[in-house]
Amino acid sequence: KPSVLRHSLNALRNEKTSLTKYRRQELMALRKAPADLAIERNTWFHVGMNASQQYIYGLRRMLEPIKEHVDNNFTPITQRLIDEYQPIRLKITDFLTQAENFIATGRFENYRELLDKAEQFETELSEYRKKHIDRIQMAQDNETFQLSLVYLNLLQESQLLISSMRHQLRAAKKFKE
């Protein structure tokens, strides 16, 4: 597993490099647009690019503590936490896929519905996080404390990924208008 995690970190670094190159190319293209259009689009372009960067940073903030945990041979994740996070992961994947589809096709007819569902999901993630904090505070077992912190970080970063998705989707819609 450590090699998979290391590979994932390298892939995120490569994505960051690609994103930086893409950003430079887009900025050059914006300079060629009429000034009034460029000014308005520039704002939404930067909001969208910042959200893209937040995806990368968020994934790295998820991955690095997990990699450290695995590298140091700490306690494996419990089946209970796996079962709890699996539907969360699937929902995140679904939201990101839907957002990608809106952006790739430029069709934003039902985007408001996705934003509303994502906002509700952020609230659910906040509840998961609060419940997990309560579990940490109630636990008598110091052996699982580090694992609990890694999982808490995963929940927090998951919430931030959804927030970034919402910002990016709004920015993409405004950019296309």
Model-derived features with residue positions:
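Cytosolic, long alpha-helical scaffolding segments
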Residues: 1-177
